[in-house]
Curated annotation (Swiss-Prot):
Protein name as annotated: Trigger factor
One GO cellular component term: cytoplasm
Catalytically driven reaction(s): [protein]-peptidylproline (omega=180) = [protein]-peptidylproline (omega=0)
Domain of life: Bacteria
UniProt KW keywords: Cell cycle, Cell division, Chaperone, Cytoplasm, Isomerase, Rotamase
GO molecular function terms noted in the UniProt entry: peptidyl-prolyl cis-trans isomerase activity; protein folding chaperone; ribosome binding
HAMAP family in the cross-refs: Trigger_factor_Tig
Enzyme class: isomerase
Lineage: Bacteria, Pseudomonadati, Pseudomonadota, Betaproteobacteria, Burkholderiales
Family that this chain belongs to: Belongs to the FKBP-type PPIase family. Tig subfamily.
C-alpha cells in the first residue's frame, strides 16, 4: 500500500492511498461465497444458488461494501503509522485514471491541533468560599415549617394578608372578551408568595370574604401565555374564603416528622447543617471549576478543527430540538435552527475539551478508581439507601463515564488552583445559592 500525505491548510490534510485491486477482488469473492451458503432465492434450495447468480444479484453491493471497508482500514493504518490524530471523519473519493491493477483514493480530513497552554503560574483565578451560617439554618427550618403549615379560616371581616390562603372566583376579559386561562372558580393561592402576578396579588391583598373587586391588570411582554402577553385585561375577583397559615413549632414533634430519631432540635439543626454543607461544597466546586475553565481557555492558543466544531453544533441543535419536543412543540424535530445560534458556544466547548485533554495527558490527571468510588459514595450519601444508588452508578457504563468526566474536571480544577494566582473571595450563603 502506497501512502502520501499533503498539508492543505492549517489543520486540513490530504492522504492519497493506493491499494492493489486484487486484494479488493479477493475479499469480494470470499464474501460472495460466504453469502451463497445462506442466501435464499426463488427456484433454488438454500445454499445451492450458483455463484454467478449470487454475483449478479449481490456483486455490486458487496463490492461497494468491501471497498469502503478496505479503504477505511487502510486509512486507519496509515494515519496511525504517520502518527496523525484525526479529527472527525475523512471525506474519501476515488481518483480516476489509476494505473492498471490499482485503486487510488484521496482522503481529506482534519487533525487535532497542538495545544499550547501558557504558564499557569501567571494565570489569575478568582476562588470563592462560603460558610453555612446559623441564619442559613434558620431559613431552612422556616422553609420546612412552611411545607408543613396548616390553615384555619379567618373571621369574615379579616382582610387577606401575606401568607394567607385565598379561595377566589375570577374572570378576566381583554377588549370585553374572555380568554383561555382567564376564568376559574374556587381557585386557591397564597397571598404574597409570587404564585400570581404582582398586580393580581396587590388587588386581592386587603380584600375580605364575600367581597368583589374589578381591576385592570397588565400582562408582561414576556408572559408565558403569548396570546395575552403585553396586553391589558380587566379582572373581576370575588373572595370566597381567607385562611390564615399556622406554622408548626420547632420542637420534638417537628424534628421527628423530619426523620430525626431522637427528636431533639439540636440534632435537627445539625442534620440541616450537614446537608447544607454538602450542597455548598458542590456549588463552590462548580463555581470555581467554571472560573478555572475560563482561565484555561483564555491562556491557551490553538486552531479549532472545523469538523469538531460542526459536530458539536449538530449535537447542540439536536439537543435543542429534543427539548422543544419534550415541551410539546409540534414538529420540533424539524424545527429550523441556524448553526450560528450555537456556533460560539460550540467553539468554546471544543476549545475547552482540547485544552483539558492536553492538560490531563501532560500531567497525569486521569481519574483514579478510588476517586471514582469516593465521588459516587458522596453523591449517594444524601439518599435514603446509599448502597442502592452506588450500585445504580456502577451498573451502567454511561453513568460511570459521566462520573469519570466530573472527577477529571475536579482534578484539573485542583491542579490549576495549585498553580495559578488565586484571588480568594468570601461570599454569603445566599449569594452562592442565588437567593439575593
Amino acid at each position: 500500500m502506497a501512502v502520501t500525505v499533503e498539508t492543505l491548510e492549517k489543520l486540513e490534510r490530504k492522504m492519497t492511498l493506493t491499494l492493489p485491486l486484487n486484494t479488493i477482488q479477493s475479499e469480494v469473492d470470499t464474501r460472495l461465497k460466504r453469502l451463497a451458503r445462506t442466501v435464499k432465492m426463488d427456484g433454488f434450495r438454500p445454499g445451492k444458488v450458483p455463484m454467478n447468480v449470487v454475483a449478479q444479484r449481490y456483486g455490486y453491493s458487496v463490492h461497494y461494501e468491501v471497498m469502503n471497508d478496505k479503504v477505511g482500514e487502510a486509512f486507519a493504518v496509515a494515519a496511525n503509522e504517520a502518527k496523525l490524530r484525526v479529527a472527525g471523519q475523512p471525506r474519501i473519493s476515488e481518483k480516476e485514471g489509476a494505473p492498471e491493477g490499482e485503486l487510488v483514493f484521496d482522503a481529506v480530513f482534519e487533525v487535532y491541533p497542538d495545544v499550547k497552554i501558557a504558564d499557569l503560574t501567571q494565570a489569575e483565578v478568582e476562588k470563592v468560599s462560603a460558610e453555612v451560617s446559623d441564619a442559613a439554618i434558620d431559613k431552612t427550618v422556616d422553609i420546612l415549617r412552611k411545607q408543613r403549615r396548616t390553615f384555619a379560616q379567618r373571621a369574615a371581616d379579616a382582610p387577606a394578608q401575606d401568607g394567607d390562603r385565598a379561595t377566589i372566583d375570577f374572570e378576566g376579559k381583554i377588549d370585553g372578551e374572555t380568554f383561555a386561562g382567564g376564568k376559574a372558580e374556587d381557585f386557591q393561592f397564597l397571598v404574597g408568595e409570587g404564585q400570581m402576578l404582582k398586580e393580581f396579588e396587590d388587588a386581592v391583598r386587603g380584600m375580605k370574604s364575600g367581597e368583589s373587586k374589578t381591576f385592570p391588570l397588565n400582562f408582561p411582554a414576556d408572559y408565558h401565555g403569548k396570546d395575552v402577553a403585553g396586553k391589558q385585561a380587566d379582572f373581576l375577583v370575588t373572595v370566597k374564603k381567607i385562611e390564615a397559615a399556622h406554622l408548626p413549632e420547632v420542637n420534638e414533634a417537628l424534628a421527628k416528622s423530619l426523620g430525626i430519631a431522637d427528636g431533639t432540635v439540636e440534632a435537627l439543626r445539625a442534620d440541616i447543617k450537614k446537608n447544607l454543607e454538602r450542597e455548598v461544597k458542590f456549588r463552590l466546586l462548580a463555581r470555581n471549576k467554571n472560573a478555572v475553565m475560563d482561565a484555561l481557555v483564555a491562556n491557551a492558543e490553538l486552531e479549532l478543527p472545523k469538523s469538531s466544531v460542526q459536530a458539536e453544533v449538530d449535537r447542540m441543535i439536536e439537543g435543542a430540538r429534543a427539548d422543544l419536543k419534550q415541551r410539546g412543540i409540534k414538529d420540533a424535530d424539524k424545527a429550523p435552527i441556524p448553526d450560528d445560534v450555537f456556533r460560539p458556544q460550540a467553539e468554546k466547548r471544543v476549545r475547552l475539551g482540547l485544552v483539558v485533554a492536553e492538560l490531563v495527558r501532560a500531567n497525569g490527571l486521569q481519574a483514579k478508581p478510588e476517586q471514582l468510588k469516593a465521588h459516587i459514595e458522596e453523591l449517594a450519601a444524601s439518599y435514603e439507601k446509599p448502597q442502592d444508588v452506588v450500585r445504580w452508578y456502577l451498573g451502567d457504563n454511561r453513568r460511570m463515564a459521566e462520573v469519570e468526566a466530573v472527577v477529571i474536571e475536579n482534578n484539573v480544577t485542583e491542579f490549576v488552583l495549585g498553580k495559578a494566582k488565586v484571588n480568594d473571595k468570601a461570599i454569603s450563603f445566599d449569594d452562592l445559592m442565588g437567593q439575593n
